[in-house]
Amino acid sequence: MQGKLTFTSKQITGIAVLLALVIVLQAVGGTVSIGPVQLNFTLIPLVLGAIIFGPWVGALLGFASGVVVLIQVIMVMVPFYALIWANDPIVTFLTCVLKTTVAGFLSGLVYNMLKEKKAVLAVFVASAIVPVVNTALFILGCLCMTNSVYAMANGTNVIVFILVSLVSFNFFIELAINLILAPTLHKVLKYIKI
């Protein structure tokens, strides 16, 4: 697959399974709430796809995840979602779709750059990139929606509100989940010949 986007039927099947996992986990069950903390498992198939099939598949899986998030923002009656969609639909659209698309692409790209030198390190870095880029682009999107975010912040500093109320523990939990599962992903890669 070097330099071209052609896939065998076995690879297409693998991509389809990961795509279905991303969509289903994002739509109905990828998040487990424990108190104020949400354990998000939807990024795992995205990372796995980026590592196994490359950056373009990572981007495809990220795009699918972002579209599901966008649909949830539009359809689910959550005050924050309603506010940002009503006030900043273009920025909301771009934030939802681009954050995971870019994260998936960069994860696969960095993995490909590092895998020949240090395979285990490549898996860890690729696994960490997705929640880091996803969260960074979410924060950037929120900063572009300052008026909407300020309305939800109830007088709190917008940056403090974003970091404490919207990001806080979830980023660290997503990062930990990805980094804990990285060795497992690495072992899976050794046995899967797709």
What are the language-model segments listed below?
Residues M113-A136:
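Internal alpha-helical transmembrane segments of multi-pass membrane proteins
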Residues A16, A20, A59, F63, ...:
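Residue-level signature of the transmembrane alpha-helical core
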Residues M1-L60:
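Hydrophobic transmembrane alpha-helices
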Residues I51-W56, L109-K115, H186-K193:
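Structural signal for the C-terminal ends of transmembrane alpha-helices
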Residues Q26-Q38, A64-F105, L109:
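Interfacial aromatic-anchored transmembrane helix boundaries in multi-pass membrane proteins
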Residues V22, Q26, V69, V73, ...:
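Juxtamembrane/transmembrane-helix interface segments of polytopic membrane transporters
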Residues M1-L19, V125, I139-C142, T146, ...:
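Alpha-helical transmembrane segments and their cytosolic interface
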